[in-house]
């Protein structure tokens, strides 16, 4: 799982979900990518699940890049706890994804297999996405 090694502060404010992505909106490393169409908090488990779905489908011969990292903690209070008495303990690590962000990239010789692998990974993510290619964006 992806989590930071060290953090300066254990608890943070919730990140803003409004606005579009400022950077990372184009396929730079691979030939195909998954681009977010709506804002979402993506947990480290969802990233890992999408990565496994892609690698199991392509087996060998391709390369995958993960362009997001879950660096923000989300806190949660225990069940059946009364209001007050401070902020809850960190429960998940999330990556704040905004519309337009390319989250995963892949290079693979066969386009059909690459698109199917990305489609399977998209089903593991909590936001609407689309498959983009390097040729489409220019």
From Swiss-Prot:
Q: Name one GO molecular function term.
A: tRNA binding
Q: Which UniProt keywords apply?
A: Ribonucleoprotein, Ribosomal protein, RNA-binding, rRNA-binding, tRNA-binding
Q: Which Gene3D superfamilies match?
A: Ribosomal protein L10e/L16
Any signal peptide, and if so, which residues?
Answer: none
Which InterPro entries does the protein's record reference? Ribosomal_uL16, Ribosomal_uL16_bact-type, Ribosomal_uL16_CS, Ribosomal_uL16_dom, Ribosomal_uL16_sf
Q: Which CDD domains match?
A: Ribosomal_L16_L10e (cd01433)
Q: Which GO terms describe its biological process?
A: translation
Among NCBIfam families, the record links this protein to: rplP_bact
Per the record, the similarity remark reads: Belongs to the universal ribosomal protein uL16 family.
Q: What is this protein called?
A: Large ribosomal subunit protein uL16
Q: Which gene encodes it?
A: rplP
């Amino acid at each position: 799982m992806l989590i930071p090694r060290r953090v300066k502060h254990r608890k943070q404010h919730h990140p803003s979900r409004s606005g579009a992505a400022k950077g990372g909106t184009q396929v730079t490393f691979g030939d195909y990518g998954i681009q977010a169409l709506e804002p979402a908090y993506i947990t480290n488990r969802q990233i890992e699940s999408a990565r496994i779905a892609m690698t199991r489908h392509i087996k060998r011969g391709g390369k995958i890049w993960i362009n997001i990292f879950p660096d923000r903690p989300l806190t949660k209070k225990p069940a059946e706890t009364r209001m007050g008495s401070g902020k809850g303990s960190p429960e998940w690590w999330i990556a704040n994804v905004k519309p337009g962000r390319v989250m995963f990239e892949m290079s693979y010789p066969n386009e059909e297999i690459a698109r199917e692998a990305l489609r399977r990974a998209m089903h593991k993510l909590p936001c609407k996405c689309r498959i983009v290619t390097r040729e489409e964006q220019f």
